[in-house]
Amino acid sequence: MSNISWYRHCSVRLQLVTLALFLLLGSASLGSAHIDEEFEDDVTTTISSIASPMRRTYTNEWAVRIAGGKVEEANRLANKYGYTNLGPIIPGDEYYLFRDDRKKSRSSRKTRSLSANQLQHEEDVMWMEQQVAKRRVKRGYRRIRRHTDDNDIFEEDDDGTQISKSRNRKHPDPNDPLWTDMWYLNRGEHHSDSTTRMDHNVKEAWDLGYTGKGVVVTILDDGLERTHPDISPNYDERASYDVNDRDNDPMPRYEFSDENRHGTRCAGEVAAIFNNSLCIVGIAYNANIGGIRMLDGDVTDAVEAASVGHNADYIDIYSASWGPDDDGRTVDGPAKLTRSAFEKGITMGRKGKGSIFVWASGNGGKDADSCNCDGYTNSIYTLSISSATENGNIPWYSEACSSTLATTYSSGATGEKMILTTDLHHACTNMHTGTSASAPLAAGIVALALEANPNLTWRDLQHIVIRTAKPINLRAGDWTTNGVGRNVSHSFGYGLMDAGAMVKLAKIWKKVDEQHRCRQFYPSRYKNIPNGNRLQLQLYSDGCYGGADENKVSYVEHVQAIVTLKAPKRGDLQIYLTSPSGTKSTLLTKRARDTSRSGFTDWAFMTTHNWGEQAAGLWILEIDNDGWDDAELVKWELVLYGTDRETGDFGGQHASPLAVRSVQMEATSSGTQYSIFHVITLVILTFSQILY
């Protein structure tokens, strides 16, 4: 090693020594800075939204924020400048949607008009933005051939098997003709050992009396065939809306290819009627089911916001089986209006308990995509669900990422079974596929838990999912045990969702403490990442114990690394985050198809793998550059979400070890002696690394 390299090597280690000495003196942690409230903005903390640059399609609609949200003022301004006021994007909010009928409905160029410029400068206009049509993809993958007969409607699989809606087959408990084929709900029925069963254990939840009654679920998709006889008794018009055509009827648009079948398929998985001699049984077969038609048209920020924010005080669970393109090169997420709708749903939905957003993790496996590049599944607000095949394998379409929370069954390779559900034209199908099929199964299971305990918050439910998910029988090479003894995988999250276990825990669950957020910045910027090399940055966190009470985090839930970096080819980068407990999360994998030179701008990579671990200690960010040229890390910050006190096995909180340690240090000398010992140990370890 050269002298220069040796000194540089020592310099990095000496920074840790300096850190230790500052800790001894009781100063704030070196290598981090507590953010003050004055730095708060609506750019990126919880939901990432910076998209890859691409050719944009501009619509003739504008989102306009009117001070006070007064409809009279919105109408006045729209009339004054020649717009049509289409009404509030979310009722009761300040954002309105204006349309300019003088312009083309779609254009590749952004409108630069005098009227738009003048409207923007009106005193009561706080913000306005021309709406862009986004590419959003349904997360099923397989096309099928359809046939009709004089009396029956059925679908044909590749091997020619037909599934009819006729009532000519009877099955006990229930008598729905396809119940015996619903392997993901009933094949573990005769296995008393819950650790070996390979289904979602819904029968146990049903036997306990939980069927989703009183819980409202809505499907955000391409429509809902509300007249389907296996759905209509549970259809709820208050949980439904047509955002595309701006009316109250979510019926899909019928066409020859039946492309708009997706929402109806998802809805049947949740709430198809029990024991009516038709098709299938929904997991939450007594739940109210609604549909938001929003994918059959231009999907803009306003469309997404109106969908995820629809009737948030009434709807309990929103299920979404779509997202940005799973092509291995897209980086995209919700924009300003949708971020606001998510945050409002979490804070105010369900009368303050928080809306439940269930999201399909994505089908980009064949293109080596990462669901951490999807700002919807990568959000702390969504319950991101992956898929497993009937044999417990990773499906070929599955995306691995650290934001996935849990798994449900879906389709797999040729010869492996798929998901059965309702279909258009009052039909049934055995060919629902991909993570599209996984998210509604999860939504149905969550509905059972909500019936067992309607007072659960959105975070309570995530805690319950993590504590009850089963890793047994799911095959992945990356299963690891985190710092609190829970098994977790990038492909399966914490494992297979277990309906029986969830309702039993939900019944006795005590509400967790309010969520705290600790933001800490890496102190220096513009770190070079040479090609073929790894950049490693160490950031010590004290859980923000030197700041305001609402920022103190002792036990983590979600963790984010918010990263801004430049790269000649974004897909050549890999990013890892290691916690003080030693749990290593893969935040970003190589994506060969991602040739973008845009890098990342304030992109919030999220991991759930540290759930329950202690926040305080050394966090390590590593960035591998396998490209042909240097990359550069501009900045990064660590965001820890969690609580000041430990969450118990049945909810509720225990005292924080950091708080106890703080009291001991103030009251006795033993606490100080412990800190001195801790610092001396750190110094010795540091110098040993230098000498090595």
Swiss-Prot record:
What does the entry list as the binding residues for Ca(2+) 3? 326, 369, 399
Q: How does it assemble?
A: Interacts (via extracellular domain) with receptor dma-1 (via extracellular domain); the interaction promotes dma-1 internalization.
Q: What is the effect of changing residue 263 to R?
A: In gk(779937); increased secondary dendritic branches in PVD neurons
**Name of this protein:** Furin-like protease kpc-1
Topological domains, Lumenal: 140-670
Q: Where is this motif: Cell attachment site?
A: 570-572
Give the GO biological process terms. Answer: dendrite morphogenesis; dendrite self-avoidance; gene expression; insulin processing; negative regulation of dauer entry; negative regulation of protein localization to cell surface; peptide hormone processing; positive regulation of dendrite development
- Keyword field contains Calcium: yes
Outcome of mutating residue 143 to A, per the record? In wy1060; loss of propeptide cleavage, trapped secondary dendrite branches and loss of tertiary and quaternary dendrite branches
Glycosylated positions are: 3, 275, 455, 487
Organism for this UniProt entry: Caenorhabditis elegans
Which residues of this UniProt protein bind Ca(2+) 2? 242, 247, 249
- Peptidase S8 domain span: 182-503
Q: Which UniProt keywords apply?
A: Calcium, Cell membrane, Cell projection, Cleavage on pair of basic residues, Disulfide bond, Glycoprotein, Hydrolase, Membrane, Metal-binding, Protease, Serine protease, Signal, Transmembrane, Transmembrane helix, Zymogen
The EC designation for this entry is 3.4.21.-
Give expression by tissue.
Expressed in the nervous system including the ventral nerve cord, the nerve ring and the retrovesicular ganglion, and in epithelial cells. Expressed in IL2 neurons. Expressed in PVD mechanosensory neurons. Expressed in pharynx with strong expression in the g2 pharyngeal gland cells and vpi pharyngeal intestinal valve cells. Expressed in intestine.
Annotated function:
Furin-like protease which cleaves proproteins at the RX(K/R)R consensus motif. During neuronal development, regulates the formation and extension of dendrite branches and cellular positioning of various type of neurons. Together with chin-1 and cdc-42, plays a role in the development of the neuropil and is required for the guidance of axons from neurons, including SubL pioneer neurons and AIY interneurons, into the nerve ring. Its role in axon guidance in glia and pioneer neurons may be through ensuring the fmi-1 protein is correctly localized to the nerve ring.
The entry summarizes the disruption phenotype as follows: Several defects in neuron development. In PVD mechanosensory neurons, tertiary and quaternary branching is decreased, secondary and ectopic tertiary branching is increased, the length of dendritic branches is also reduced and branches tend to overlap. Secondary dendrite branches are trapped next to primary branches. In a sax-7 (nj48) or dma-1 (wy686) mutant background, significantly less secondary dendrites are trapped. Increased dma-1 protein levels in PVD neuron dendrites.
Q: Where is this region: Disordered?
A: 152-177, 230-249
Molecular function GO terms recorded: metal ion binding; serine-type endopeptidase activity; signaling receptor binding
The way this protein sits in the membrane is described as:
Single-pass type I membrane protein
User: Which residues are listed for substrate binding in this entry?
Assistant: 222, 259-260, 304, 321-326, 332, 360-363, 374, 376, 436
Cofactor: bound how, per the entry note? Answer: Binds 3 calcium ions per subunit.
Q: What is its main location?
A: membrane
Entry coiled-coil feature ranges: none
Subcellular localization? Cell membrane; Perikaryon; Cell projection, Axon
- Indicate the secretion signal residues: 1-33
